[in-house]
């Protein structure tokens, strides 16, 4: 695979100057482009100086030709051919690596609260991190999963060099659906996660239980084979005894993704004798990610009352699955 060290483009700098910046100075050590050869214009300010084209062939195009855009909170929209992976290497790696799938209803990637801030937390614990800025499906249901599979291929091929011997996945909301897809719809041992962490995930495509926008953007309501796709991407139906051990976290007052999604997946894991831990807190709603008060200010984290408990439980579990 070719390695290129390229300067920032003037156009890219210009667009970034208008963008908001995250409440963290952490930046990736490397940014890997899954399909294209160079990072073009983007308002995204979180990328590495070292850009590496991975050289994967794009099997399915999401047919999105709009430029990327970003919100004040770091929600990165319209990711297409510049699908990329931000790599973060800890000073003292413990052998674990986590592929991070931010949420966003398959419309955008919440690249700060469910990406960058996750990486910062993981790095402090010696975990190598790959934050995946995956393509939006735009009704092409295989697109995000193709990006995850290629991310695992790239990470597995470099694992020995990085001092990594275990690679898992974490996903939030629609990114949780993607992480659960990676955990149930893997192709081989290379693409199979060693463990899975799902935070307020979308699991089912069942109308009335799923998140409507996630379903529509993934499989489109007008698809000829819609009912077959709905079954395939209702991931509680895809769990087997080979599904990786799982950690699930959510709030019972979630008004965006019903808690029943997580319960369906939990029950399927239990039925298939897959080790699972699930934590349900009474309040916090949806989308709290790793956006703690140190990023948003005191009193602005709806999950502050339980965050320490969540982080301690996750840290313990990550040590136990080693």
Predicted regions and their residues:
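N-terminal cap/lid segment of alpha/beta-hydrolase-fold proteins
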Residues: 22-93
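Short beta-strand element of the alpha/beta-hydrolase
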Residues: 95-103
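Primarily recognizes the serine-hydrolase "nucleophile elbow" in alpha/beta-hydrolase
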Residues: 146, 150-214, 230
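Short beta-strand/loop motif that positions the catalytic acidic residue
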Residues: 242, 248-250, 254
């Amino acid at each position: 695979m070719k390695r290129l060290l390229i300067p920032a483009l003037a156009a890219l700098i210009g667009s970034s100057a208008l963008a908001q910046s995250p409440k963290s100075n952490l930046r990736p050590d490397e940014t890997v482009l899954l399909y294209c050869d160079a990072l073009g214009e983007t308002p995204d300010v979180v990328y590495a100086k070292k850009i590496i084209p991975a050289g994967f062939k794009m099997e399915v195009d999401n047919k999105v030709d709009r430029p990327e855009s970003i919100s004040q909170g770091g929600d990165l929209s319209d990711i297409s051919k510049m699908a990329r992976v931000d790599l973060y290497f800890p000073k003292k790696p413990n052998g674990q690596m986590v592929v991070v799938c931010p949420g966003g209803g398959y419309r955008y990637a919440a690249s700060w609260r469910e990406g960058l801030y996750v990486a910062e937390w993981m790095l402090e614990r010696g975990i190598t991190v790959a934050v995946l800025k995956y393509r939006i499906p735009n009704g092409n249901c295989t697109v995000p999963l193709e990006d995850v599979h290629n991310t695992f291929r790239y990470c597995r091929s470099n694992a020995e060099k990085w001092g990594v011997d275990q690679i898992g996945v974490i996903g939030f909301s629609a990114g949780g659906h993607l992480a659960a897809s990676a955990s149930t719809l893997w192709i081989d041992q290379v693409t199979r996660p060693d463990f899975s962490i799902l935070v307020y995930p979308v699991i089912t495509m069942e109308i009335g239980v799923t998140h409507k926008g996630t379903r529509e953007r993934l499989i489109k309501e007008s698809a000829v084979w819609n009912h077959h796709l709905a079954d395939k991407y209702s991931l509680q139906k895809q769990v087997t005894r080979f599904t990786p051990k799982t950690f699930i976290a959510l709030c019972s007052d979630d008004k965006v993704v019903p808690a029943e999604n997580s319960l369906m997946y939990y029950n399927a894991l239990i039925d298939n004798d897959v080790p699972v831990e699930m934590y349900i807190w009474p309040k916090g709603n949806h989308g709290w990610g790793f956006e703690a008060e140190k990023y948003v200010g005191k009193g602005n984290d709806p999950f502050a009352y339980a965050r320490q408990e969540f982080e301690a439980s996750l840290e313990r579990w990550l040590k136990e699955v080693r």
